[in-house]
Every structure is written in structure tokens, then in C-alpha cells.
Design a protein with these regions (language model features):
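Hydrophobic faces of well-ordered beta-strands that scaffold small-molecule active sites
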Residues: 6-16, 37-40, 66-73, 91-95, ...
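Catalytic alpha/beta core domains of metabolic enzymes, predominantly
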Residues: 116-212
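Glycine-rich, proline-tolerant flexible connector loops at the mouths of alpha/beta enzymes
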Residues: 36-56
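Short, acidic/polar
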Residues: 17-31, 77-85, 125, 199-203
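Short beta->alpha connector loops
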Residues: 18-21, 73-77, 96-101, 117-123
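Short, small-residue-enriched loops and turns at beta-alpha junctions
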Residues: 44-48, 74-77, 121-122, 145-148
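Active-site mouth loops of central-metabolism enzymes
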Residues: 6-23, 68-77, 185-196
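Acidic (Asp/Glu)-rich catalytic clusters
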Residues: 27-34, 52-65, 83-89, 104-110, ...
């Protein structure tokens, strides 16, 4: 899938609270198999982050030729922080919620926007279209830590069909393998029926893989 910089097919998730040694190991593994994009979250209640922490992780990932797609709290996306993350080399930004038009325009000029596939509305799409960002956006589903909280395959397919009709590329999550992220350690899938599947089987079972 072509974006502004990368061809995304498969990626990984990395989390700064796992420690730099674990993060570096994952990045080394990604570089070895030419994976170029990783999801991360900068919204970690158990591990509050400063903008300098976020920028350092972006720079570390870039040193392994990996671009991050970070989930960042709206309050942390000040003009100064956007500039700092852009300077560190950040290319993508996941927006869980839309702010006002000026905020969206500021973010869209700095980064390729990654919207929440589950909540993205046609009105939001038209706003991005008017601002000139609709051709470069990506939609990313949520992952669901709790057993039975993931969405059904039917809902997943319906959402994807609507997004594909708009020309929007879609990303989603498979459960992952060891070490599973805490505190529940139940995997982080988008589709509930994928939760107990082996990683390779989950990849093969994922309809997104044949449509993006």
C-alpha cells in the first residue's frame, strides 16, 4: 500500500514502556525482514511520557529505517510538540478524535493522517477532502485487549468496504505473539475470532491483507 513514504503490508507494534533493549530488538528484527512501519502508543497511563521521550523513540525507529504510527493524546499535539515530532522524523500521526479545522489542518500539513477506522465518519472524510488530505489518509482499526471485546468479522468487513469505496487504505491488528502486552496478556486483535489464532494463521485469515 503506497503512502507518502512507505509501502505498508505488514508491520509490528512497539511500546516504549517495555524498555529500550526490547524495543531495539524488535527494530533489529524488523530491519532484517525489511518491515518499515510500526504502531506505537504514546498514551500510556502507567508510563507518562514527555515530548522528548516520544521524539527519542521516533529517532530510534528511524535509525532502523522504521516509521512509527503513534497514537498521541490530543492535548499533547500542541504546535510546539508537532514541530518537535516532525523534526525528529515522524511521518504518520494516528488521530483517535478530530479537533477543530485549524488543528486538523496543522496536523495534516505535518504528517500523513491515520484515522480511527471504527469511528471515522463521512463528514470527517469530507473535511479532509476539502483540506486536501483525503488522498493520503489511512484508516487504522482499534485493537481490543479484553477477551470478547473485539469486533466481529462481519462488522470488520462492512467498515472496510465503506472505507475502500472512499479510496481509503485500511490497517488492522492481529493478536501478536510472545511476549503478549500486559496487563491482560490476551493478545491485541481487531477481530475477536482471531484472538486465539497462531500469528501466521491470523495473517492468512485477515481479509485486510488481500484488499490493501
Amino acid at each position: 500500500m503506497e503512502t507518502s513514504k512507505r509501502n505498508i503490508s505488514f508491520g509490528r507494534s512497539i511500546y516504549i514502556n517495555l524498555g529500550e533493549q526490547v524495543v531495539t530488538q524488535v527494530l533489529e528484527e524488523m530491519k532484517a525482514v525489511r518491515q518499515t512501519v510500526a504502531f506505537t502508543s504514546f498514551q500510556l497511563p502507567e508510563h507518562p511520557l514527555e515530548i522528548s521521550d516520544m521524539a527519542r523513540l521516533v529517532e530510534l525507529a528511524r535509525s532502523y529505517e522504521v516509521d512509527l504510527i503513534p497514537d498521541i493524546a490530543h492535548k499533547d499535539l500542541t504546535k510546539e510538540n508537532i514541530a518537535a515530532l516532525k523534526k525528529a522524523g515522524l511521518s504518520y500521526l494516528r488521530l483517535d478524535e478530530f479537533g477543530d479545522e485549524a488543528f486538523i489542518e496543522r496536523c495534516g500539513k505535518a504528517f500523513t493522517l491515520v484515522v480511527n477506522a471504527s469511528t471515522f465518519t463521512h463528514r470527517e472524510y469530507k473535511l479532509l477532502e476539502r483540506l486536501g488530505f483525503s488522498r493520503q489518509i489511512i484508516a487504522c482499526h482499534n485493537y481490543y485487549p479484553k477477551v470478547y471485546s473485539g469486533i466481529s468479522l462481519e462488522k470488520f468487513t462492512t467498515i472496510n468496504q465503506k472505507l475502500h469505496a472512499l479510496g481509503v487504505k485500511v490497517l488492522a491488528f492481529i493478536p501478536g505473539d510472545e511476549p503478549l502486552r500486559g496487563p491482560l496478556h490476551e493478545g491485541l486483535p481487531t477481530v475477536e475470532t482471531h484472538r486465539t489464532l497462531d500469528t501466521r494463521l491470523a495473517i492468512c485469515a485477515h481479509p485486510v491483507g488481500t484488499q490493501c
